Amino acid sequence: MKKTILVFCLIAFFSDTAFAQLDSIRSNKNEFSIGYGLLPVSSFGFSPWSHYYPTEDNVGAIFATYTRRLTKVIGIGATYCFDPRVYNYYENPQTKEGPIAHLGESSHTLMFHLKINWLNTKYLNLYSKVGQGIMVWGYNLKEYQPDLFEINMPSNKFIDRINYAYQFVPIGVEVGTKRCAGFIQCGIGMEGIISIGFRYGLKDKE
């Protein structure tokens, strides 16, 4: 991942001049966005005993970002992600008979990102993005019967609930105006494999 970040930064540096002339229309310096992503990665450390495996209901990631454009091509910013999940343990997972426990897990992520706007036209924007940061997760266990079943519990130490977080988006598409646009992006990380959302650009001072 570190090599990927380095290569990405070098590409951004050398592409800034090449792509700057394409961005004579869309040049908001401050941008905010909110989105929803499917199948975000997780580093949740809950592992059951050898006989019991959970069924997982992945709600998806909800995230918000702020980006400050340093040039008409390169921007940096921060991203916050919230990822709730539900794990259900049964004696027979296939038929969902014999409930053992219900576990609600959630993670909070803060990442700093680099965004490269490859193409900017009046109504279309193409970009790539990479981010790194930290994730903090926690859980809430319900209906657990420890006298009947044994499940390995996560560590209660806060330091053990902190993990590395990342997001890599090779391609993202924004469609709309300079001020408001919808977006869809494909990648891997805390924002999900496929994400959709809304981007709003603050009007620059004259």
Name each model feature, range by range.
Residues 32-40, 78-82, 128-134, 173, ...:
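Transmembrane beta-barrel strands of outer-membrane/channel proteins
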Residues 4-14, 20:
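Sec-dependent N-terminal signal peptides
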Residues 20-68, 199, 203:
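Short glycine/proline- and aromatic-enriched beta-strand/turn motifs that initiate or cap beta-hairpins
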Residues 83-87, 157-206:
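Predominantly the C-terminal beta-signal and adjacent terminal strand-loop region
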Residues 48-52, 95-102, 154-159, 181-183:
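Extracellular loop and loop/strand-boundary signature of outer-membrane beta-barrel proteins
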Residues 38, 60-145:
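Gram-negative (and chloroplast) outer-membrane scaffold detector with strong preference
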Residues 28-30, 56-62, 104-110, 124, ...:
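Residues that define the transmembrane beta-barrel architecture of outer-membrane proteins
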Residues 27, 39, 71-73, 119-123, ...:
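Outer-membrane beta-barrel channels and translocator barrels
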